[in-house]
Amino acid sequence: MAEHADTQALLRLVTWLSPAFPVGSFSYSGGLEQAIHQGLVTSADDLRLWCETLLERGNTWNDALLLSESYRAYGDAQRLIAVSELAEALAGSRERHMETMLLGEAFLAAAGHWPHPSLAVLGTKAAYPVSVGAVAGAHRTGLKPALAAFLNATVSNAVSVAIRCGITGQRDGVGVLARVEDTIGAVVARAAAASLEDLGGATFIAEIASLKHENLHSRLFRS
């Protein structure tokens, strides 16, 4: 089947990765709230560095690889199940596991309005990047557009977290999105050409923040 590099594919990606899509991503910070609480992220510049680091060598990079593999594997039940199990195992903390699995479950439920028989193998539960990748692959949106939409949505959610935590305003938050565009583009190109052999990360502070967050006394987010 040919890739749908057209308006329909674009509309679907914009819808699926929109803040209005009912997955509940607004309630998760991926450890960013803890980093803000510790004074590790205090400005728009800090936020940009945080996002770019995760994109290039953190869990966001791994999510991009998992999405790519799921996109390619959508018609191969055994391969798709394997990447789904791997994605769940890679969750580095209890809250990170909760976040990726609940987002993935909600995404699959909402994406049911765009049914495809090959998605039945996932059932109702899969990690978030696997759910997005499999659905995008089944509907042939194009891998690079799917990656770009997913990564941009991830950064957008981090900006929303930062605004609600009071470390940046809306204008500077949008500025972060503008300044991260080139990094997203580079990561899209890398991830589309990479494989699961390229999984890995070196963002220990972010991982520890995710672990510590569950003990944060007063918080706005679930992770």
Curated annotation (Swiss-Prot):
Pfam families: UreF. One of its GO terms (cellular component) is cytoplasm. Keywords: Chaperone, Cytoplasm, Nickel insertion. GO terms for molecular function: nickel cation binding. Gene3D superfamilies: Urease accessory protein UreF. It is found in: Cytoplasm. It comes from the Bacteria. Its main location: cytoplasm. Belongs to the UreF family. UreD, UreF and UreG form a complex that acts as a GTP-hydrolysis-dependent molecular chaperone, activating the urease apoprotein by helping to assemble the nickel containing metallocenter of UreC. The UreE protein probably delivers the nickel. HAMAP family: UreF (MF_01385). Required for maturation of urease via the functional incorporation of the urease nickel metallocenter. This is Urease accessory protein UreF. It comes from Sinorhizobium medicae (strain WSM419) (Ensifer medicae).
